[in-house]
């Protein structure tokens, strides 16, 4: 497949190289970081591999790990309030204590530290903090949740049949500037490396995996009129997400769409009881004016199993439900889950109802979603 008309390798080819202990280059969306990273599996780490990454990558060598592994090693987030643009989930940096390690910065020491991060008998106290290796917490669900190099690294290792952990480093040009796609292609040729895109990795995984399962599908009467409600349960954490749609469309049609960052539990109940946030009320009105469209409620609650029970009551009572539920603080929208829901709704082109154009665009093309227009409201 190609990226900006440049021929890239297939995901299958990259998986085979990761399995063989080789380095691959992974590029992301030009609307995101527009960078390339050297990526390898942690299980295949050697001092020589670290030296190659440090010498020819020139960026910061990091070790993407699963949330589960980070908890096992007591690797807490580096900061309590992550304000970096794409919320890369750095933990406190580490060095392996002892085992022949001294300063922690040599390629030997860094390779040993990465080995320790995936060894089952490594204990939290075996790791000195801070150190010279920077673990990254990958989102559960991988690139289907977040189109980042962190998730791509863990996904590729897992797809190669290895432990879900890896090594990455950003690739810089010799003058210290970021290497963009044309330079990355030359780097790949020079070192005979495979080069793939996160966009293609997402497409590969969407063909083979799904993070959602439809649990409910029925017509519902709201104060904004009749809508079709679909409830989806996320298999990584059992959260329940809601899609409310009006009208019909074909697969090539750009559909008016709002991806809502508030909580599904509260939003759907407030839609029925008349206590809905004014911005979402405006979205309903826009869709009614259009005659068709979709509103997604991406649930941010830790536990949302009760939502399916509540929706069952809503269905049985024709939408006559008045429950007073507490408001919870929402995190950023989960566009990976939203993308899978949109694909299930036969939506690939959207007219996005939004107030902040730039942040909505980040990473979206990786999910094969084309934003044809931004509708301000």
Positions of predicted regions on the chain:
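Catalytic domains of riboflavin
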Residues: 1-377
């Amino acid at each position: 497949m190609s990226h900006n008309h440049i021929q890239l390798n297939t995901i299958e080819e990259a998986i085979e190289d990761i399995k063989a202990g080789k380095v691959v280059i992974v590029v992301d969306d030009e609307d995101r970081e527009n960078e390339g990273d050297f990526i390898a599996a942690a299980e295949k780490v050697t001092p020589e591999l670290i030296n190659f990454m440090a010498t020819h990558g020139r960026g910061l060598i990091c070790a993407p790990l699963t949330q589960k592994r980070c908890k096992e090693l007591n690797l807490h987030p580096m900061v309590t309030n992550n304000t970096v643009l794409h919320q890369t989930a750095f933990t406190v940096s580490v060095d392996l204590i002892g085992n022949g390690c001294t300063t922690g910065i040599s390629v030997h020491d860094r390779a040993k530290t990465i080995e320790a991060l995936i060894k089952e008998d490594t204990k939290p106290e075996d790791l000195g903090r801070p150190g010279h290796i920077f673990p990254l917490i990958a989102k559960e669900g991988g690139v289907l949740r977040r189109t980042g190099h962190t998730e791509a690294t863990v996904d590729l290792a897992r797809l190669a049949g290895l432990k879900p952990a890896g090594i990455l480093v950003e690739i810089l040009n010799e003058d210290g500037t970021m290497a963009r796609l044309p330079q990355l292609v030359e780097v790949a040729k020079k070192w005979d490396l495979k080069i793939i895109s996160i966009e293609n990795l997402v497409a590969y995984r969407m063909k083979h995996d799904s993070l959602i399962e439809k649990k409910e599908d029925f017509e519902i009467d709201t104060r904004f009129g009749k809508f079709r409600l679909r409830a989806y349960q996320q298999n990584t954490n059992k959260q329940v997400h809601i899609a409310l749609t009006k009208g019909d469309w074909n697969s090539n049609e750009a559909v008016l769409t709002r991806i809502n960052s508030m909580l599904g539990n509260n939003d759907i109940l407030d839609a029925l009881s008349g206590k809905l946030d004014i911005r979402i009320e405006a979205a309903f009105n826009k869709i009614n004016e259009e005659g068709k469209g979709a509103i997604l409620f991406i649930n941010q609650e830790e536990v949302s199993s009760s939502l399916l029970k509540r929706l069952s009551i809503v269905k049985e009572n024709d939408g006559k439900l008045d429950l007073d539920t507490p408001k919870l603080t929402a995190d950023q929208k989960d566009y990976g889950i939203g993308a899978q829901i949109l694909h299930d709704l036969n939506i690939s082109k959207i007219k996005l109802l939004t107030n902040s154009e730039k942040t909505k665009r980040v990473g979206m093309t990786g999910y094969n979603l084309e934003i044809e227009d931004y509708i301000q409201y």
